[in-house]
């Protein structure tokens, strides 16, 4: 089992570099940037890098299965078009399939690897207001086509704060989270990442595919990192 550790200062520095890379591409404040990545450290770099720039991240689920790819490409292209994203950030694994997706979009979409953005010079953080849009989240599409929902910074922080309200009010309590929920999902991102940063607390992320292949990895991580959430 391979581990990658990222500290809060490292995350801050990496997000500033991602923001610099996006700015060099011409991404501006208020633009939407699609993110199609699995559970990897670069996901949070990119997500918060987009916010750092004052742009709006749009997390979309990656092609986790090779079956039904035609349906995946069509649905993802429709979401990219609805979100009006002209830039899609991905990694090497998911990026191999994104070319087919963007060709199905109504407007041009540029694909960029997260690894290239991390090499850019950092830029200062944009000044945002509580009513500014923080992210666009798509509904699951269980009963119809996925629909975009714009969430403001105030709404996201209120949700994270409400989750933290259930934590014990004890000075000696040191929370540590362990999750295998996907980061493009609201529970993985809003339910786990945001509260961990707001508290702040350590958080161990397990790729969903690793958990599905070996569920015991979750229990081992809970024991190893003393997870209580």
Locations of regions flagged by a protein language model:
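Short, well-ordered beta-strand segments
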Residues: 32-36, 51, 134, 176-178
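AMP-dependent adenylate-forming
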Residues: 1-7, 134-136, 143
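Structural motif
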Residues: 36-38, 89-94, 181
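Conserved pre-ATP/AMP-binding loop-to-beta segment of ANL
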Residues: 119-138, 144-145, 150, 155, ...
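A short helix-loop-beta submotif of the ANL/AMP-binding
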Residues: 19, 40-65, 73, 78-87, ...
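Structural core segment of the AMP-binding/adenylate-forming
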Residues: 24-25, 52-121, 126
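Conserved AMP-binding/adenylate-forming core of the ANL superfamily
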Residues: 1-48, 65-72, 127-128, 151-157
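Conserved AMP-binding/adenylation subdomain of ANL enzymes
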Residues: 157-176, 186-228
């Amino acid at each position: 089992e391979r581990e990658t550790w990222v500290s809060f200062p490292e995350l801050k520095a990496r997000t500033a570099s991602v923001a610099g890379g996006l700015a060099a591409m011409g991404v501006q404040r208020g633009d939407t940037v699609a993110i199609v990545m699995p559970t990897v450290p670069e996901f949070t770099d990119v997500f918060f890098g987009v916010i750092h720039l004052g742009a709006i991240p749009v997390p979309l689920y990656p092609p986790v299965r090779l079956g039904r790819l035609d349906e995946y490409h069509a649905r993802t292209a429709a979401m990219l078009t609805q979100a009006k994203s002209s830039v899609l950030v991905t990694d090497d694994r998911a990026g191999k399939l994104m070319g087919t997706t963007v060709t199905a979009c109504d407007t041009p979409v540029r694909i960029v690897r997260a690894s290239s953005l991390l090499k850019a010079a950092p830029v200062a953080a944009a000044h945002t207001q509580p009513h500014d849009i923080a992210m666009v989240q798509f509904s699951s599409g269980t009963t119809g086509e996925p629909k975009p929902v714009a969430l403001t910074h105030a709404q996201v922080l209120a949700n994270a704060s409400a989750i933290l309200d259930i934590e014990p009010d004890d000075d000696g309590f040191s929370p540590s989270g362990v999750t295998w929920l996907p980061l493009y999902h609201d529970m993985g991102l809003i339910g786990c990442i945001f509260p961990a940063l707001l508290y702040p607390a350590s958080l161990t992320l397990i790729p969903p595919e690793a958990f599905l292949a070996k569920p015991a990895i979750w229990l081992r991580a809970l024991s190893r990192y003393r997870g209580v959430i």
